[in-house]
Amino acid sequence: NLCKQKNAVIMAHYYTEGVIQDLADFVGDSLALAQKAAKTDADIIVMCGVHFMGETNKILCPDKKVLVPDLNATCSLAESCPADEFAAFVRAHPGHTVISYVNTTAATKAVTDVVVTSSNARQIVESLRADEKIIFGPDRKLGNYINSITGRQMVLWNGACHVHEKFSVAKIVELKAAHPDAKVLAHPECKGAVLKLADVVGSTAALLKYAIQNESREFIVATESGILHEMQKACPEKTFIPAPPEDSTCACNECNYMRLITLQKLYNTLKYEWPEITVDPEIAAKAVRPIHRMLDISEKLGL
């Protein structure tokens, strides 16, 4: 009812808790959320995700009110790439096209030529000239993976996701031995040794699609465990096993920041229309260009 009264739309990332995903009007990965935000006719966007996702929505929809239930929901990748340090890195490599992963702050996007997500990074890199000099940040593991499948030699920033870097290769091998018919699904933010074990490497949306279409009954999933909710909903007859982290005493395959988005906070955010995302207009004017470039290229490529 609150949504109807306020003409609000609730968007949720696949990494949020299942109860949040079930309440959302739209659930997706970073690319799908950006595409949806750019086209929504709602007056208020409630972004159930981390801070940079709210910023991206606000940059794309400056006239709309964009809310995030907890402003402390940041991102280890975005935090690993401070805008001033990244700008200095860019200046140290003149003549390079700058590609930033969507998991960055608005200020970092502002010194970027084109933004990518894990759904379109390979295709966008391949759309550039073969001899193009490229800087890629902040996720070094994703950058290494893109280099390996495209033959490019992008200069990489040294950032990492606190969830994806903690998966245990040895424990995944043990799981695979115990479940020999299981397919291993891995996000490209994982370390290279995990990706070598995978039957498929892809974005959350790509892994979900593979799980739905593949005939296997069991899957070992090496990405944030929130995606298992959507996988299980789509395929109740299949078994999805979260890939274990090195440290078995923690829920390390959960994003600490995504888990800050709770049902109570979502209700309060809708009721009080707070906390609101704001982006400095000067930064937004620069950051919108690489985001639009990503959306334009993705549309041309049918992504």
Write out the residue ranges for each language-model feature.
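Active-site loop-to-helix "anion-binding N-cap" substructures in soluble metabolic enzymes
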Residues: N1-G202, A206-V221, L228, Q232-A243, ...
